[in-house]
Regions:
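Low-complexity, serine/threonine/proline-enriched polar segments
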Residues: 4-7
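Active-site loop segments of alpha/beta catalytic cores
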Residues: 9-251
Length: 251
């Protein structure tokens, strides 16, 4: 729904009353499916076209591989929703219903691994980079979830997908996660991610020089050229230029 004075649509909370005895992980997992022949043909034709007709590097979004992305939890494309759809309820379920979340992710991963194989066959080396996750793990000052929760619920499935991609292709893998995720980065590297975006340098602990010193040999940092919360929208042109120049010196 778009507010009368707004410029974008708000996702309405359509959480149905939760009956713990009838709660079925497959209601959330139903959001994911194996790619169709038409989907694969589109990916194959598009990547080949850009590969043969341009000198651009090509990255492809692999659908259905972001575990717990709260932009997708409400399932705004569905007429009716089942399962856990309220974002606050979802985050609480990471602690209150971990078995439920695990089963959702387990089914999602099963489907995602099939899609990795299909996409690898469809586009091969026409792509150089793939986007698999836009799940934000950080707030301004800390992580959304504890490291133990990440390691038990998210990491096993992310690693399974990344390992399969690296096994079948030469693609590099990037994850998008805003926020203060410094403490999570070693686990992201261990899970097989090659590139981190957007590098929110305004968040706690996300100093560009320190990130490069600590993790630069294992991870590509894509972004972080300027503080997009303060300097870019509110700074003077000279302040923007200076910050970008300072950031370039880190590279």
């Amino acid at each position: 729904k778009m507010p009368q004075s707004g410029y974008f649509f708000d996702a309405l909370n359509r959480q149905q009353p939760i009956d713990e005895e009838k709660l079925d992980p497959m209601d959330n997992a139903a959001d994911f499916g194996v790619l169709s022949a038409g989907d694969l043909d589109y990916y194959a034709r598009s990547t080949r076209k850009f590969y043969e007709e341009t000198d651009y590097g090509i990255y492809v979004t692999l659908p259905g591989m972001a575990f717990g992305d709260v932009a997708l939890i409400p399932a705004t494309w569905r007429k009716q929703t089942k399962g856990i759809r309220d974002i606050q309820e979802w985050y609480m379920s990471l602690i209150m219903r971990p078995d439920y979340i695990y089963k959702v992710f387990e089914k999602q991963c099963e489907i995602a691994l099939k899609n990795v194989e299909l996409m690898a066959n469809a586009i091969g080396n026409y792509a150089q980079l793939v986007f698999v996750s836009g799940t934000d793990f950080g707030t301004q000052n800390s992580l959304f979830v504890g490291l133990d929760t990440y390691r038990s619920l998210f990491k096993p499935f992310q690693k399974a997908i990344n390992d399969k991609i690296h096994e079948l292709t030469d693609w590099k893998i990037f994850i998008h996660s805003c926020g203060a995720i410094y403490d999570l980065i070693p686990d992201l590297i261990d899970a097989g991610f090659d590139v981190l975006n957007p590098v929110q340098v305004s968040a706690k602990g996300m100093d560009a020089q320190n990130l490069k010193n600590e993790f630069g040999k294992d991870l590509v940092f894509w972004g972080g050229g300027v503080d997009t919360q303060k300097t870019l929208p509110f700074g003077t042109p000279d302040q923007v230029y200076k910050e970008v120049r300072d950031r370039k010196s880190v590279v």
